Design a protein with these regions (language model features):
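Beta-propeller domains
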Residues: 1-298
Length: 298
């Protein structure tokens, strides 16, 4: 590739980031060194892999799952599969129609892959999950048996004590934020709209032993830019910057919007908290990667 071609091709589409165009299945993989016999299971990863070979941003592009199965001290297989979404087969399908209606079955499901309650789910924060088989074939859109009304963040949190899966979905129209809780058995048992100021892009959140923590930050959805194919998010100096703390619900007590305590913080954006916990004094500590601002469009 020439220097000119490398300059013209975005970094997320060249070199090690370039899309993989073949689906491969391989068995009895060669191993350098040794794999402990006790290490057994599947390692899966998800990422943007545009089938067309082009995407405007590395957040875009069709989802592709790569997987390796380890068992009995051997690497049993490797395979990679596109997540067979509507967006893959109907690239021009719009999740948001001109009238503002939203179809959450449309999405690239390219950000994360999780296992919970016997389900393997490929996630993207704009849409419903996609269920996969153990061999990484796509089963289809999964909406918790019709109970899920919001999108599902690509970064849900699994409680190691209860086995519950906590997640949220943000919306371009009210309700702008919905908190959801799934039992260890895989049933959606709680959905709570949470009041935030506007259509903010909430990429991630935190849970601690006793609390759920939301970040209501000044990167907001821009409907007009979305309709013209531009970057649909922008920085808004007038949007309040807040962190919300809500007690976690239990079998005996349910908490929701009225129980959220909001704290004003300095303007910033956070994609991901690395850790959140309660110290011995009961204070909540959050470790985050903090940007002073993001996607300003002056």
């Amino acid at each position: 590739m020439t220097d000119t071609a490398e300059t013209e091709t975005p970094f997320h589409l060249r070199g090690n980031y370039a899309p993989v165009m073949e689906e491969v299945t391989a068995f009895d993989l060669a191993v350098t060194g040794s794999i402990p016999a006790e290490l057994s299971g599947r390692y899966l990863r998800n990422g943007a892999n545009p089938k067309s070979g082009w995407s405007p941003h590395w957040f875009a592009g069709d989802g592709m799952i790569h997987g390796v199965e380890l068992r009995d001290g051997a690497a049993q297989w490797y395979r990679n599969r596109w997540v067979q979404t509507r967006s893959l087969h109907e690239p021009k399908a719009r999740m948001i129609d001109a009238d503002g209606s939203i179809d959450r079955t449309i999405g690239v499901n390219n950000t994360h892959v999780i296992g919970h309650a016997g389900k393997i789910l490929a996630l993207v924060e704009s849409s419903f999950p996609c269920e996969l088989s153990p061999d990484l074939d796509t089963v289809g859109v999964y909406d918790y048996n019709g109970k899920l009304d919001s999108a599902m963040t690509a970064h849900p949190k699994l409680c190691p004590v209860t086995g519950e899966l906590h997640f949220f979905g943000y919306g371009f129209f009210e309700p702008y934020l919905t908190y959801n809780r799934v039992s260890a058995q895989g049933e959606l048992i709680q959905s709570e709209p949470i009041d935030v100021t506007g259509p903010t892009m909430i990429h991630d959140f935190s849970i601690t032993e006793n609390h759920v923590i939301f970040m209501d930050l000044p990167v907001v959805f821009d409907f007009d830019k979305a309709m013209t194919g531009g970057m649909p998010y922008r920085w808004d100096d007038d949007y309040p910057t807040r962190v919300g703390v809500m007690p976690r619900s239990t079998a005996d007590t349910s908490y929701g919007n009225a129980d959220v305590t909001w704290f004003d913080v300095d303007p910033c954006y956070v994609f991901h908290p690395m850790n959140s916990f309660e110290d011995a004094a009961g204070q909540i500590i959050m470790d985050t990667a903090r940007y002073p601002e993001l996607w300003r469009q002056d």
